[in-house]
Amino acid sequence: MTTVTTLAVANPGAMRAAAALAYAVTCYLLFLASFLAFAAFVGGLLPPPFALDVAPWQAAAIDIGLVVAFGLQHSIMARQGFKRVWTRIVPPVAERATYVLAASIMLGALVALWQPLPGAVWSVENATGAGVI
């Protein structure tokens, strides 16, 4: 005699909601990790992990490209037109978490790929000016 066991999901909507919540929590934890890495990097506690031996103009070009890519990702994904198209691919309930995931990946890439520049790029000598900044 063969016995067949079937697993029935009592409430598929609840399963989808739980999966969306788990996805969102994972995305926000990744954001926390990338933001903490960024804070440590800016504070001088984390050296650039992939610093290349390149000319200063090349390092500046890489850094500018990273900042532009980060800004473009934020700007494009924040637009209503993009969200309308994007929510045809990604469930609307996961749209914000996916935005956070993409931003976290971009921030992590910015930290990981940043190229140090020799010398001071800019400096404020005035104590009042430094306090304002």
Language model region names:
Residues 2-133:
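Membrane-anchoring alpha-helices and their flanking helix-loop junctions
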